């Protein structure tokens, strides 16, 4: 997939495609045929500082760690973005989410992994 601006982190998406974060830029969503579906910045009107880790949960929502803003946002397929973590992160980098509603964030600023519960309903 050409024409990315500093690709950093990547995650498979529920549609068979993938999501990729761009350094100091945006987060792009691609189809299974590797065509650009959307950019989260444009779709949601969201301004990223330095998007880092990305993951897609069982509901198809995209989670993005912002290294510069020290936050994690959830971007649902429908509806407005939700800030899941706004405190307690120094330099969020890689991320993963479980089917049990747990979010794992590698905090490079504190050399640790932090675990958050973000979904109330069980799988």
Regions from the language model: what does each represent?
Residues 1-17, 24, 45-61, 88-100:
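Beta-rich, blade/repeat-based domains predominating
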């Amino acid at each position: 997939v050409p024409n990315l601006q500093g690709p950093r982190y990547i995650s498979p998406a529920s549609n068979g495609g993938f999501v990729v974060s761009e350094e100091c830029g945006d987060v792009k969503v691609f189809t299974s045929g590797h065509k650009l579906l959307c950019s989260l910045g444009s779709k949601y009107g969201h301004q990223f500082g330095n998007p880092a880790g990305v993951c897609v949960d069982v509901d198809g929502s995209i989670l993005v760690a912002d290294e510069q803003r020290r936050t994690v946002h959830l971007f649902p397929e429908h509806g407005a973005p939700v800030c899941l973590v706004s405190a307690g992160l120094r330099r969020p980098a890689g991320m993963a989410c479980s089917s049990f509603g747990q979010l794992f964030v590698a905090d490079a600023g504190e050399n640790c992994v932090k675990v958050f519960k973000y979904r109330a309903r069980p799988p």
